[in-house]
């Protein structure tokens, strides 16, 4: 059993962090916190607007601050942005303050899930598939390094992925409220 004050979901965009995260939070009576939403709330601007005015570096600065603020709490299910793992300080904080679940997804599934999503600044290019392959090549080793457990979400609906995680978490994450 691995004790940790929070449950933290990591993984690329389109893996299901928000959808599965909300379900898991409800199942285990945890507060659901989406770091991207915390960034928007603190900045008073959408993520595409932050990217437009401050670039990716400015966005990552907002992300660092929001993640640090969020992870001061406990009893939360925290859904991170796909790039949160790029910052070494974020990785250290995530490892220290949570039991980490890596939701893995193939590029093909990402393309299908994100086909109509226009709110992803990194995907506002005609070569979306290549962008996703490049992001995966760079980020996957970081996700793996942090993960306490990993679930491939490709074959599952959000409900099925949640059910699989409930069983895994009940035996691997030391929380009194995780008894199935």
Curated annotation (Swiss-Prot):
EC top class named in words: transferase
Matches recorded under Pfam families: SKI (PF01202)
UniProt-annotated location(s): Cytoplasm
Keywords noted in UniProt: Amino-acid biosynthesis, Aromatic amino acid biosynthesis, ATP-binding, Cytoplasm, Kinase, Magnesium, Metal-binding, Nucleotide-binding, Transferase
Gene Ontology BP term (one): amino acid biosynthetic process
Function: Catalyzes the specific phosphorylation of the 3-hydroxyl group of shikimic acid using ATP as a cosubstrate.
HAMAP family: Shikimate_kinase
Name recorded for this polypeptide: Shikimate kinase
Gene label: aroK
